[in-house]
Amino acid sequence: MFLLAHAGITLGAAYAIEKTVNCRPFNSRPAAGPADSRVAPAPLRVDYRFILLGALLPDLVDKPLGHILLPDILANGRTFLHTLLFLVITILAALIIYRQKRAMWGVYIAFGVLTHFIMDFMWCDPVTFLWPLYGAFEKHPGISAWILEKWIQTLFEEPCVYLPEAAGFLILLFFTTRLIVQRKVTAFMLQGRL
């Protein structure tokens, strides 16, 4: 998967979850009487900046690390941040942050990382996904030289790539247009609201 699919589809999924959670029938039912002490929970307010960060984080770190900084050692764009170990650490850190500070930003990052793994089908690459159980990451020598050409070719020839990219683009276009029309770009930048 490329940038648009990771960003757009993850953003759309998080938005759908937020709207579903905030549209519970429980919130719309009147109290049964004075003895009914049900209190509607506070609405979920997602900070989409952290969702986007989590969705892009594995590629933001692993691609430069494997192709630019350490191409002779790693020669792979899916390394440390594409492993189950990283996902587990991210989720545990999110839970600790939430428990200690009642802050949701770690959960949002973990959600973004999880969706990144799902879209990359990481379980299909057990050497990377289960690292370090199977030893070192597989090397793809020479890939850095033709990576841009290969990405462009794959983008236009593989439906499993260009369809999610197109969907991600449309979702990002929808949210960007909406933010501009409603003049909420600043609110998104400062508070992560859509």
Give a label for each model feature.
Residues 1-194:
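N-terminal membrane-targeting hydrophobic helices
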